[in-house]
Each structure stands twice: as C-alpha cells, then as structure tokens.
Amino acid sequence: MAQTSLEIVSPEKRLLSRSVDMVVIPAAEGELGVLPGHAPMIVLLQGGTIRLYQNGQVTDRLYVAGGFAEITPERCTVLADQARPVAEISATEAEKRLADAEAAYATVDKLDITALDAAMESIQAARAMVEAARH
C-alpha cells in the first residue's frame, strides 16, 4: 500500500517523522483524513487528537492544542501549538487545564472579541485534551 510521509513539529521539538498509510487530523472544519495523493492544502487545526494508521489500525495518537497542517500529495506536515502523545496525558492534568481555561474565560471582558475567541479556543483545546485522556 502507498504511504504518505508525516511530520509533527511543536515549538519544543520534532515529535514524529515517519511514513504512514493514513493520518486523521483535527481540522477546524472537522476531522480530515490524509491519504497518499491527497490534494494540496493548508488547514487550520483545532484542539484534538491526531490518529496514525498502519494496515487499517490506529498505531499512535497524539494530542494537539491547535496549529496548522500543510498537505501535499506526498506528505503531511503538522505545525502544532502544543503536541504530545495521548499516553502521556493524565485525566487529572487534563481536567485541571479545563478548569483553568473555564476560570480564565469567566474573567474575560465579553466585549473584547479577540480575548473572548482566545478564551474559547483554550476551552475547546482543554476539552479535547480531557477527551483524549479518557480514551
């Protein structure tokens, strides 16, 4: 089966660089499956889980808080704001992050659209982290 090259990079380090049969990324418009030969595009990512597939099975799962992905017919490059393997996330840590994000939202000036959007993105990413930690 043809494969696509996948690279996942966070500000701290390159987390992953290898070939996969398929990768599913949490695009802002919804989950997006990337197979070899995919149409070129750049997509905005929302908080969620990236799933890597080999032989029809999920082999790895990584949490991302957001970022961008560049897709070409040969490769998918993810530039993540924050990223880490799902196995390294504890439910307690994720729930604390969600509580902190909700507390920060409560203090935001509701007339400041930019701050409100940022607070909502933090809550969405924290909810995605909680969901990832539970699976």
From Swiss-Prot:
Instruction: Please name the InterPro entries in this protein's record.
Output: ATP_synth_F1_dsu/esu (IPR001469), ATP_synth_F1_dsu/esu_N (IPR020546), ATPsynth_dsu/esu_N (IPR036771)
Q: Which domain of life is it from?
A: Bacteria
Give the protein's recorded name: ATP synthase epsilon chain
* NCBIfam families in UniProt: ATP_synt_epsi (TIGR01216)
Please name the Pfam families in this protein's record. Answer: ATP-synt_DE_N (PF02823)
Cysteine disulfide links: none
Assembly state and interactors? Answer: F-type ATPases have 2 components, CF(1) - the catalytic core - and CF(0) - the membrane proton channel. CF(1) has five subunits: alpha(3), beta(3), gamma(1), delta(1), epsilon(1). CF(0) has three main subunits: a, b and c.
Record keywords: ATP synthesis, Cell inner membrane, Cell membrane, CF(1), Hydrogen ion transport, Ion transport, Membrane, Transport
